[in-house]
Amino acid sequence: MALHTSNLGYPRIGLQREWKKTLEAFWAQKIDEQQLITTMKEIHLEHLNVQKEKGIDFIPIGDFTYYDHVLDTAYMLGFIPSRFSNFTSYLDIYFAMARGSKDHVASEMTKWFNTNYHYIVPEYEEGLNISLKDNRPLRLYEEAKRELGIDGKPVILGPYTFLKLAKGYTQDQFPTILHKLIAPYVQLLTELHKAGARLIQIDEPIFVSLTKEEMIEAKKLYEAIQKEVPSANLILQTYFDSVEENYTELITFPVSGIGLDFVHGKEGNIKSIVEHGFPAEKTLAIGCIDGRNIWRANLDEVFALFETLKAHIEPKDWIIQPSCSLLHTPVDKTEETHLSPELFDALAFANQKLEELTLIKRGLSEGVNSIEIEITTYRNSHEAVRSSAARNRKDVQTARASLKEEDFSRPLPFEQRYDLQQKALQLPLLPTTTIGSFPQTPEVRQTRKQWRNGEITNEQYEHFIEQETEKWIRHQENIGLDVLVHGEFERTDMVEYFGERLAGFSFTKNGWVQSYGSRCVKPPIIFGDVAFISDMTVKETVYAQSLTNKVVKGMLTGPVTILNWSFVRNDLPRKEVCYQIALALRHEIERLESSGIRIIQVDEPALREGMPLKEKDWDSYIEWAVQSFRLATASVANETQIHTHMCYSNFEDIVDAIRALDADVISIETSRSHGEFIHTLEQTTYEKGIGLGVYDIHSPRVPSKEEMYTIVEQSLKVCNPKYFWINPDCGLKTRRTEEVLPALEHMVEAAKEARTLLKTNA
């Protein structure tokens, strides 16, 4: 029985975000297509070489991309919407699908399962030529072999997951389209096998949440594929949860091996193996290192896991690997020496996780005693973190223990509150607003960098922020928006900003991960107990309000989003960490209210994405997520209007949860998802304030007034005009000023036209 190390995927962005910078240089026409291709090749080969040097036996090939691996698969299989047919080159089509263009709406973008990564949603339409348009995995496999002598492991998104993630077809069409995918996948696998690929990883993360009937359907698909490629060694890879509901079916699939997540699906997967065994003729790939978080492994638990498995099964081979792709972790921790010693020692980024895999292999091969020094070091680092003062704050623990039922509820029900708020705010019908942020121009970023480097004083930086704020208050007034925002020019990131001002958080210098396309984020680390220290947003918001007679919203990030967009300590339940954050935000909201701010927006874009993948686990998550939001917001007066915002989500599953938040107004991404939430509201009612986004801010394209009016018109068929707001999909931080101003002008024009029509029909 052989023992191997493997990786499921490696961060694309590069140690210094070289990947991001190359892409953006190409989009800005600072480099040409050939320079893009050459530089991307160099970055990819460097990533492969790192994994080789770390001792990984099966190095993934095909996880690298120019934008998104799901988009790669869509292009490869010919899922190219007809609206892009006038483009001729691969890159023009590819980036138009991802980002849109002046005349083309981009494909929808949404979260990859319950992670913080976004993928481009494949679109099916009648007449698609579903075929192997480009065998990209083969090209990359041969390149790695030729350039580096690496016999890699091609990684492919599986056909069942791919089609489940796609949109544009009815459920009745699913079996027919699935059948059409057999031929291109057979060709893809045949060519890889003939080229010498000794192992091919097929990712089917959707398998963790399929019904019995769907699993049987998926098995028939793989039987059809295996019949045509019988000698290819396929590893069917699952992750993000267990496969316990369908384990007995999965182990009969006609593949050489199966990969299971023993971190996020540990309990269910162990239970399945203990009860049902594992085929002796198959390889078991064991995801024993957390691919989604940044903490060092608990080696005692890892070796105990292997002892449990060995006691019940004898697979053909063992593969030691992360629980999922390392795409979700930063590249390397070596630059983070500014962190406290106990925190630094407790961290493991992607490169350190690869080292952990080789260490575990050595311990299993040569005996645990051979790595006793390393195990002792790990134990000491875990104990140092556990006993640290940051994780043992009595004030935080006392506040949590003192919570009462009334701390989670507003004094009056929504209808009564909203009437009081309308009297106080005097807003027009269909009020217009934005989601919060305005463009972070090169000047804004450069000035912030100068301030952080000590090149300008605090006073100079604050003066600059005030100038930007005033400029955009005037822009908003001139455009005719009804509720204004200060623009968030002082903030780098909607989570990082608050984490820097709360106790319990730590920050990396280079801990970047990919969010979507070239957009990278640097998640905070929730290391200790979270607590309020002092005002975080009051000064900037009050200043903005002093500049105008119109209402200015206070802008906060909600507790669930801060939790879901951070690397979270793994010694407490997530619910408890979220309650700590909510209590800290409650202080800030009370400070804003006492300073005269009458609308306070608490964004929760990550509420839906944090839901467990299995429906049986939803109720528990929704209960504490909703309670966390209410804990943060419930102490304000009835006249104070609480807003929230969500984006990138399949909201049909959580309409009841959205109601339960008891926010006075919610704004929701609508335009890029092609109006799916409008369809959801046709099936149910939502009698609270709501704004359905009227244009996609993730594309540089400026939509017309007519396009926005159409969305408003559709929305008003399912929403009460009394409670309806008009806004963009999301914040405008990543857009340019010359894109934002005309788009907002068109939005206000659309609102005026809609008001006129409503008054005419009244």
Curated annotation (Swiss-Prot):
Co-factor: note: Binds 1 zinc ion per subunit.
Pfam families recorded: Meth_synt_1, Meth_synt_2
Catalytic-site annotation from UniProt: 698
Amino-acid positions noted as binding L-methionine in the UniProt annotation, renumbered to this chain: 435-437, 488, 603
UniProt keyword annotation of Transmembrane present: no
Associated pathway: Amino-acid biosynthesis; L-methionine biosynthesis via de novo pathway; L-methionine from L-homocysteine (MetE route): step 1/1
A GO term, aspect molecular function: zinc ion binding
Residues noted as binding 5-methyltetrahydropteroyltri-L-glutamate in the record, renumbered to the chain: 17-20, 111, 519-520, 565, 609
Keyword tags: Amino-acid biosynthesis, Metal-binding, Methionine biosynthesis, Methyltransferase, Repeat, Transferase, Zinc
One annotated GO biological process: methionine biosynthetic process
Swiss-Prot/TrEMBL catalytic activity: 5-methyltetrahydropteroyltri-L-glutamate + L-homocysteine = tetrahydropteroyltri-L-glutamate + L-methionine
Family as reported in the entry's similarity comment: Belongs to the vitamin-B12 independent methionine synthase family.
HAMAP family: Meth_synth
NCBIfam families, alphabetized: met_syn_B12ind, PRK05222.1
Its biological purpose: Catalyzes the transfer of a methyl group from 5-methyltetrahydrofolate to homocysteine resulting in methionine formation.
Name of the molecule in the record: 5-methyltetrahydropteroyltriglutamate--homocysteine methyltransferase
Gene source species: Bacillus cytotoxicus (strain DSM 22905 / CIP 110041 / 391-98 / NVH 391-98)
Name of the coding gene: metE
